[in-house]
Design a protein with these regions (language model features):
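Active-site helix of classical SDR
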Residues: 109, 143, 151
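Substrate-binding pocket helix/loop in short-chain dehydrogenase/reductase
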Residues: 85-86, 90-95, 178, 189
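C-terminal substrate-recognition "lid" of short-chain dehydrogenase/reductases
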Residues: 197-224, 229
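Alpha-helical segment proximal to the catalytic Tyr-Lys
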Residues: 114, 156-160
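Residue(s) in the substrate-gating loop at a strand-loop-helix junction
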Residues: 127
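Conserved glycine-rich cofactor-binding loop
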Residues: 10-11
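Conserved NAD(P)H cofactor-binding loop of Rossmann-fold oxidoreductase domains
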Residues: 77-82, 227
């Protein structure tokens, strides 16, 4: 049985990707924070890990090294948003967002490098906000731009192995977090999206499936945004 890791895999896009991998026969380890994940899913092992905390991250890595002889797929999906203006964002806010989206995933792939066999898949969750600016999420956009750069640069570390590294770049998606937006804000986003709605989780998960199934897609930022533009 192949083994996969999905960070932030108990809700939204992460859970959708995890279930897709389960359907492909993977055993899936996932990290999460917040309330305990109590749903029982076969071959799915959720582990509570605060990815802003290096000690917790390294404990998770040690657990993976103890349990697994190889890791065939890593989906670096976890991210963090703190909605504050540019001048209100503190050093701590900035550090936490960078730690979750960028630093923890750099460490995860680096520490598990020797367990990643030829022909594996590494996929990052980026964001449209990492390509174009957006009000009130400057720091989030910067973290996602760094995620995009990390994905593209990691390609060279796996050159000649058949292992591919890509990033999926979603626009606005019908996740629990997005559903909490005020209706006025959602309608404004709909107007800026050529298809006039948010993506479903399943539509975004299809892009991850494509990266897993196609061995020649490598170093790509794959946008799934419904034709979103800042008009």
């Amino acid at each position: 049985m192949k083994t996969a890791i999905v960070t932030g895999g108990t809700s939204g896009i992460g859970l959708g990707v995890a279930k897709m991998l389960l359907g492909k026969g993977y055993y899936v380890y996932t990290t999460y924070v917040g309330a305990d994940f109590t749903e029982k899913i076969e071959n799915f092992e959720p582990i509570k890990v605060d990815q802003t905390n290096r000690e917790e991250l390294y404990r998770f890595i040690a657990h993976i090294k103890e349990k697994c002889s190889s890791i065939d797929c890593i989906v670096c999906n976890a991210g963090m948003t703190i909605r504050k203006s540019f001048t209100e964002t503190t050093d701590y806010d900035w550090d936490c967002m960078m730690e979750v989206a960028v630093n923890s995933h750099y460490i995860l792939v680096r520490e598990l490098y020797s367990l990643i066999p030829a022909g594996s898949r590494i996929i990052f969750t980026g964001s449209q906000m990492g390509l174009m600016p957006h009000a009130m999420v400057l720091s989030y956009g910067v973290t996602k731009a760094a995620v995009h750069a990390l994905a593209k640069n990691l390609v060279k570390e796996f050159e000649g192995t058949g292992t591919t590294v890509n990033a999926i770049v979603p626009g606005f998606v019908e996740t629990p977090w997005q559903k909490e937006k005020p209706e006025e804000i959602k309608q404004n986003i709909y107007r800026k999206t050529a298809i006039h709605r948010f993506a479903s989780v399943e539509e975004v998960v299809d892009a991850y499936r494509f990266c897993i199934e196609n061995p020649f897609v490598n170093g790509s930022l794959i946008e799934v945004n419904g034709g979103y533009s800042y008009k």
